[in-house]
Regions:
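Solvent-exposed loop/turn and edge beta-strand elements of beta-rich ligand-binding domains
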Residues: 1-395
Length: 395
């Protein structure tokens, strides 16, 4: 609907090669939706007042619109919304011939009858406007296009949903309103894109259906967009149109004791290091040998990453500390006990790795036990003149 046709009548018989520069009369008509007996809707345009947009008065006879002998041309001069004039063509009923641009016909006399050369009913086909879309995935905390820790923005899954009342044709299949017409995945840069001719003219919504590794769907708000220009990709990669995800965060906790008496070791520092980024912070045990990165234990915001006492907060990443989240980003970490006065005389446990992979889950390291350092003993042996052996031991 909304297409317009320009009709030109010339008083005389002409061909396309010798048409006068000025027609005798000109009319512009529009298309109007009409329903067939079977319910099929067609968009029709005729030389009558109901369809007329502008132009001269019609020729009439006995109260009816008629065309006198002469030459008539018709050409689509305005495509309907969502369609292109370029590539449009007309076809007579039952004919395979495609007429592009101006169509010319003559009204001639056959005895007492006026005859219209060719058909008096044609179908016009227009090419629909098609475009595409490009979306950017970003980290919710940093607004960056790079994932935090070992999390990645690659392989996020997006669904493109039609919001059009009429069915749309995508890759040879018709889709109704609210149906998913295409699923796309992000690349290593967090960008997902369609081709420039995938989506027909209309309105769509893009929403995340699967978060990338290490991320939650939290923060991923759907975005609506429209295809209005042919061959154009709608760019949604800006900071205000990107889709954001919250990285998974967790915590760790444990207890430090000495072997034998199970003495709780206070003031023992542990270095926590990201295997992916190398970011490293120190956590310290309290008077009971306990330690935790949770904000319930010590606020992330209190002396953040000072690493001096058990009350200093821990926070990984470049965003502002947030006590509603875990301190550790989705990643693998190396835990290393550091030498201090509190573990003097004990053998330090060897460094070990832990994985933070579940959101808001605290990894319990259990009880970490330092064994006493082994004492070094020196033994000497001497033989007397009589050949008998005697042993003297000392420390």
């Amino acid at each position: 609907e909304g297409a317009e046709f320009t009709w030109k009548f010339y008083a005389g018989h002409y061909t396309a090669d010798n048409l006068p520069s000025e027609p005798t009369k000109t009319w512009v008509t529009k298309t109007i939706a009409e329903k067939d007996s079977d319910g099929t809707i067609h968009y029709v345009s005729r030389l009558s007042d109901e369809y007329k947009v502008s132009g001269d008065s019609f020729y009439t006879q006995d109260g009816k619109n008629v065309l006198p002998l002469g030459t008539l041309t018709v050409e689509e001069t305005k495509a309907p919304n969502g369609y292109l004039l370029d590539g449009a063509y007309m076809q007579a009923n039952g004919s395979e011939e495609q007429i592009k641009g101006m169509y010319l016909t003559q009204i001639t006399e056959d005895g007492d009858i006026a005859v219209l050369s060719g058909s008096n009913q044609y179908h016009v086909s227009d090419k629909v406007i098609r475009g595409g879309v490009k979306i950017q995935k970003r980290d919710l905390e940093t607004s960056d296009t790079k994932g935090q820790g070992s999390a990645t923005l690659k392989d996020a899954e997006f669904e493109i949903i039609s919001l059009n009342d009429n069915a749309v044709l995508v890759e040879g299949k018709l889709y109704s309103k609210n149906e998913v017409v295409k699923t796309i995945l992000t690349d290593i840069e967090g960008v997902a894109s369609t081709s420039a001719d995938l989506l027909p003219y209309g309105k769509y919504r893009i929403e995340e259906s699967k978060a990338p590794e290490g991320y939650l769907t939290d923060g991923a708000e759907p975005i609506e967009f429209e295809i209005t220009e042919d061959g154009k990709i709608v760019d949604l990669t800006g900071t205000d149109t990107s889709i954001y995800n919250q990285v998974k965060r967790g915590d760790l906790e444990g207890v430090k004791i000495g072997a034998g008496t199970h003495q709780r070791l206070a003031g023992v520092p542990f270095r926590i290091t990201s295997k992916t980024t190398g970011e490293s912070h120190i956590i310290v045990t309290d008077d009971n040998g306990q330690f935790s990165t949770s904000s319930d234990w010590a606020s992330h915001k209190h002396n953040t990453n000072a690493g001096k006492t058990s009350e200093d907060g821990i926070w990984f990443g470049t965003s502002e500390p947030d006590d509603s989240k875990g301190a550790l980003i989705y990643d693998t970490y190396i835990i290393e006990e550091l030498r201090c006065e509190g573990n003097k005389g004990f053998e330090l446990i060897p460094p070990f790795e832990i994985v933070v992979s579940r959101n808001n889950v605290t990894v319990d390291l259990g009880t970490l036990t330092d064994e006493y350092e082994k004492e070094i003993s020196i033994h000497t042996t001497a033989t007397g003149k009589d050949g008998e052996k005697s042993i003297v031991a000392g420390k």
